[in-house]
A protein has these predicted regions:
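N-terminal targeting leaders
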Residues: 1-161
């Protein structure tokens, strides 16, 4: 992600070790109106990254649950519930029908990726997602327009025919 922050989108590496959706973090496209929107890469990990992250991921939210402040014993367990609610909220709201947005759930944080019509619409979408139950934070990587070089997220590899 450092490449994205440094100035423009980076494309996922085509070569190197295989990457999989090992942790099953929910990642779905919730709106589809902007056909040329750069498609974000989903949450993919190499085997080495999985080994490195597994322990940390198993610990997130454990102390919160032990002291009775959280319903589930791990923060990542909420994501499978949160993302469908976020999807319904965005689709039923009506203000975002002219966007192309993907949402990713990781540790009760919702990351927004994709294209919107204006900065005001981006801000409104972020605020709307904050209203969804159990969301602990929103990471807004939405862009105005469809310029792939302006994307603030890794881009998916083009589909092979």
């Amino acid at each position: 992600m450092a490449l994205c922050a440094a100035g423009g989108a980076a494309q996922a590496p085509a070569d190197g070790p295989p990457r999989t959706k090992a942790f099953n973090d929910p990642f779905v496209q919730v709106t589809h109106a902007i056909a040329q929107c750069p498609v974000p890469e989903g949450p993919l990990y190499t085997e080495a990254e999985v080994r490195e992250l597994a322990h940390v991921r198993s610990q997130h939210g454990g102390s919160c649950h032990r002291v009775g402040c959280c319903r589930l014993p791990n923060s990542y367990l909420y994501d499978a519930e949160i993302i469908p609610r976020v999807q319904r909220y965005i689709q039923q709201d009506g203000r975002f029908d002219d966007t192309s947005v993907w949402v990713l759930g990781e540790r009760r944080l919702v990351t927004l990726k994709g294209c919107v019509q204006s900065q005001a619409q981006s801000d409104s979408l972020e605020k709307a997602v904050w209203l969804v139950d159990d969301v602990m934070g929103v990471i807004n990587l939405l862009q105005v327009g469809t310029d792939a070089a302006a994307a603030r997220y890794l881009l998916a590899l083009p589909q092979k025919p």
